[in-house]
């Protein structure tokens, strides 16, 4: 019985030692090596691997030379892996930590772009037959974020793309509100129908 306890203790010590060695190895990896590894993986489109290297920079060198760029790159790699919620959170974090960064417009732009795709039902719902049940919450959030981006950075390199997305989103949201208004009108819910129509007139006056 004593041997079993001894084996358990030794196993625990061994596992603890492995964990400590892993942490030490990670901390001992130079920041520049981690950054170069991340860039190499981005170039080869290994975005998951790139995210791992960037996380290691953020964890081991939070105030390092490459920390700021690593956090910016995390916005991109999360976006490319389809992890839009994480990309949005990374953009918000970057804006909060580096409001004076020369590329801050990119973070604001990506906030809008991630919202554009984050709602998995955004495009499938656009085709649904039950028009009044479309959920355009994600579209509205994306519309608001991209509008904020255009107001803040009208000279940004990303303006043209943001505007094209806004046209699509505006038409999508207006179509949803109009279909919902008709749906409520047919069922005699006149107040609800009026509210939907008023929303379009007030917020989307130039919708085609």
Label each region the model flagged:
Residues 2, 17-208:
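Acidic, polar-rich low-complexity tracts and alpha-helical solenoid repeat scaffolds
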Residues 7-14:
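Bacterial N-terminal signal peptides
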């Amino acid at each position: 019985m004593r041997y079993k306890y001894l084996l358990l203790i030794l196993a625990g010590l061994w596992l603890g030692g492995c964990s400590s060695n892993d942490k030490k190895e990670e901390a001992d990896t130079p920041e520049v090596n981690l950054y170069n590894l991340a860039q190499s993986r981005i170039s080869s489109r290994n975005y998951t691997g790139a995210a791992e290297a960037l996380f290691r920079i953020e964890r081991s060198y939070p105030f390092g030379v490459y920390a700021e760029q690593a956090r910016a790159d995390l916005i991109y790699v999360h976006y490319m892996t389809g992890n839009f919620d994480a990309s949005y959170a990374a953009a918000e974090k970057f804006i909060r930590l580096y409001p004076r960064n020369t590329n801050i417009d990119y973070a604001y732009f990506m906030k809008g772009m991630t919202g554009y795709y984050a709602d998995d039902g955004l495009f499938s719902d656009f085709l649904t037959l039950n028009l009044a049940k479309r959920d355009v919450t994600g579209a509205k959030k994306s519309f608001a974020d991209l509008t904020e981006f255009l107001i803040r950075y009208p000279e940004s390199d990303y303006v043209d793309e943001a505007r094209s997305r806004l046209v699509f989103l505006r038409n999508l949201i207006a179509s949803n509100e109009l279909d919902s208004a008709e749906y409520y009108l047919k069922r005699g819910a006149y107040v609800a129908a009026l509210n939907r129509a008023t929303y379009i007139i007030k917020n989307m006056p130039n919708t085609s």
